[in-house]
Amino acid sequence: MREIHSLFSLSLFLISSSLSVALDYNVITPKEFLKDGDTLSSPDQVFQLGFFSLDQEEQPQHRFLGLWYMEPFAVVWVANRNNPLYGTSGFLNLSSLGDLQLFDGEHKALWSSSSSSTKASKTANNPLLKISCSGNLISSDGEEAVLWQSFDYPMNTILAGMKLGKNFKTQMEWSLSSWKTLKDPSPGDFTLSLDTRGLPQLILRKNGDSSYSYRLGSWNGLSFTGAPAMGRENSLFDYKFTSSAQEVNYSWTPRHRIVSRLVLNNTGKLHRFIQSKQNQWILANTAPEDECDYYSICGAYAVCGINSKNTPSCSCLQGFKPKSGRKWNISRGAYGCVHEIPTNCEKKDAFVKFPGLKLPDTSWSWYDAKNEMTLEDCKIKCSSNCSCTAYANTDIREGGKGCLLWFGDLVDMREYSSFGQDVYIRMGFAKIEFKGREVVGMVVGSVVAIAVVLVVVFACFRKKIMKRYRGENFRKGIEEEDLDLPIFDRKTISIATDDFSYVNFLGRGGFGPVYKGKLEDGQEIAVKRLSANSGQGVEEFKNEVKLIAKLQHRNLVRLLGCCIQGEECMLIYEYMPNKSLDFFIFDERRSTELDWKKRMNIINGVARGILYLHQDSRLRIIHRDLKAGNVLLDNDMNPKISDFGLAKSFGGDQSESSTNRVVGTYGYMPPEYAIDGHFSVKSDVFSFGVLVLEIITGKTNRGFRHADHDLNLLGHVWKMWVEDREIEVPEEEWLEETSVIPEVLRCIHVALLCVQQKPEDRPTMASVVLMFGSDSSLPHPTQPGFFTNRNVPDISSSLSLRSQNEVSITMLQGR
């Protein structure tokens, strides 16, 4: 569909708005003023700067200073978008320092370029203000150095040569912000920016929403993988994507003298307008194009397609099944899909090629920054890390190059018939495709069928025998370990849990469901039941029994016994009536039950529990999966660390190791473990630091979203610390108690020390416990792990990130 846009009324208004003689400048100096009715034009007479009104009928006196295309008329930049002038007495002045200053008739400043610029003012030599032929309003030092330019401060429009992205050195970010309405240029509901977590990707977000609205995807050398319309434009435009340690940006330039602009409108649509030969703006394409373009409409491992009724339809990728059969429809599509056959890294998973896909969300990905790895190199790297779920080339030109790895579920995919990219997904079986045309004979088929039946019968019989043998062997192993651990029979546990009734279901752990139960003597228990289809659960079960059986500490959950029957394995723990920590801190209503005293008690308790594992138990134990969901709370809200299935023990002075099988929870893993498989006691320290920040803020690290930037929780808190800004915390009554604020700030300081990038920089848990118990000065933290230097928002908060003891009722200052 093509649309033609014209605003002749605005043009007529601009011509007639001034009662005095209108002047058209080519250059403005500090000695000159741009009055309402005057204009500043580009050398080629394509762009103009001046005053205009957007609402002639209801608000004709509301005037804006902005840049526009002269013919056909289109506003591309507005200076005072938040603060319109009233009447036609406003004027623009260029100061001797090169600052643009907008005043009303009473000489009150309404806007200045210095308020938007991050550059420090300096003495300017003969500053000039002019418009380039590309539409860039430039304040320059004479004819050379740029003091300020409008291209650094986009509004809702991107012109040829402008950038979208981020300069990490100067902290300059280039993003689009929609207008509120067609007649109100103040910031609207939508922003378009470059997300630099993992492989950079263009994302559209509705302000205030935690998730994306639309993801144009990552750059693959030719276009963004979620914007096929841009791929179709390759003959009209040259696209440029720059990625370095200092800057990541995207820009475009037209071919064949095409005049074009990209506009983010007030409804969240990205429009490409092209000037026609008839001198009109024609809508060339729109993104999102259809409902399937909206973010993760079908959930994990699913693709969206438009059906014959022109409505979205979700389907699982081949080899996957709906996560919830009852809820698998378009209204509940976000539930997504799961593997039909679970992956099992130890049994050498296969990678299956899925062609023509929109690359999944790369927020939690790793990529080859130098773009030098081959696809085979990429496969080897992904295969060596059990947490790697898929891989692909970063650049599809010249046969493909570069490496992109995903960790976690793959979301926001769709299939394209003539667009998209190959993605290689980890599967729990080797997929073999037969493409031959020969017809198999009936005799051969019969023989094969009989052989298959015999093999299946033998396999079932052998499995039954092996189940009994393994169960008995495991039971003997437990007894030989002399663990002094009661072994319950299955009947007792079945009676205690009312045959594992749904009413007694407490939740799902790493390897299976957990049920509440009550023994005959009245003791309440929690039964962790190993899931039958858990590929790695038996080994973790054995590990957990052997590790925790003889551990005794008030901040560790107590193991009461186990149950083994065949390959059915269950752990019986003391029951924690208040569930887990995440049940409280991440819920707005329930979090009010945790005042600061209780939160601090939980922090101290977890610290003492980890210290016991690292230093005071008979073996040095690294938990490897410390998170809010694995901290249980008793009747008095005392914390108890649970779930030792992934823990590793060491004897003597050993305190670190490496593995190819990276397991745990992303968001809590330190970088050296998640990327290289290297873990140590400092891995738990990192997880503990993340947990402390989550307890204080009530936000999850990995799921943290902010309307104004793409930082995770660690990056968000770190930026607030470095810039002496304030941090958001729950609106709780305990924040009104001035006496707790120094303690809260000290906890944040300690947490930042725990999550530092390098393990050798992190304190030991013994040092952490001492830090909490004293008022001694703390070292300055360095940059945390998994931090990328991105945009920092304006925060309204109740704590200033300072660690010294200068206290006031509303704010803390000084570090």
UniProtKB/Swiss-Prot annotation:
Transmembrane segments: 439-459
S-S bridge residues: C292-C304, C298-C314, C378-C403, C382-C388
Residue span(s) of domain Protein kinase: 500-783
Record key words, sorted: ATP-binding, Cell membrane, Disulfide bond, EGF-like domain, Glycoprotein, Kinase, Lectin, Membrane, Nucleotide-binding, Phosphoprotein, Receptor, Serine/threonine-protein kinase, Signal, Transferase, Transmembrane, Transmembrane helix
Catalysed reactions listed for this entry: L-seryl-[protein] + ATP = O-phospho-L-seryl-[protein] + ADP + H(+); L-threonyl-[protein] + ATP = O-phospho-L-threonyl-[protein] + ADP + H(+)
Extracellular side, ranges: 23-438
Protein's UniProt name: G-type lectin S-receptor-like serine/threonine-protein kinase SD1-1
Organism this protein belongs to: Arabidopsis thaliana
